[in-house]
């Protein structure tokens, strides 16, 4: 009995280790895509709208889960900020979108809810969370809802691309 149990535990450990390594590799590639595509942003007020971030948030939400999505969004935002291609406002927008989109997909397994979760998480929650950062840390004058429209526009652009890309990836069982 002990031998069978130990064999089971070893197989389970190897399988979990393989899954973790795969997820880390995918997250690394998504972070690299986010950093390399950073010049593809457009300024709206104090923010730099970056639809590619929302595309990779949705890919991470669907294929990696909310935990990896949030960590990936944080690292991408940090690297974009360090290279001068992002702002502090990227943190709440990308991380809230990845979290809400990831949780929506994790509990429903429905792609449309991942898309809506990303839009809501970034466009509403992330935009409202960006307000104190803009006002108190960046010293910008802004109304409470000033970032909602730019964040929704940015998120919608990435979501439209993600609809086609994630659907294709799901159909090919990637």
Report each predicted region and the residues it spans:
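Loop-helix junctions at membrane interfaces
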Residues: 1-174
């Amino acid at each position: 009995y002990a031998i069978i149990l130990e064999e089971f535990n070893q197989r389970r450990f190897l399988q979990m280790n393989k899954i973790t390594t795969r997820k880390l590799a995918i997250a690394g590639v998504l972070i690299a895509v986010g950093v390399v595509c950073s010049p593809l942003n457009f300024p709206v007020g104090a923010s730099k709208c970056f639809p590619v971030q929302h595309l990779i948030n949705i890919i991470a939400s669907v294929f990696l889960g909310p935990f990896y999505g949030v960590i990936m969004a944080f690292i991408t935002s940090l690297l974009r900020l360090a290279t001068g291609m992002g702002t502090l406002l990227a943190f709440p927008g990308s991380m809230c979108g990845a979290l809400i989109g990831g949780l929506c997909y994790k509990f429903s397994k429905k792609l449309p809810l991942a898309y809506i979760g990303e839009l809501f998480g970034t466009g509403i929650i992330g935009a409202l969370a960006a307000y104190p950062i803009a006002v108190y840390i960046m010293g910008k004058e802004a109304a409470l809802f000033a970032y909602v429209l730019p964040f929704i526009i940015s998120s919608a652009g990435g979501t439209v691309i993600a609809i086609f890309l994630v659907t294709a990836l799901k159909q090919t069982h990637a």
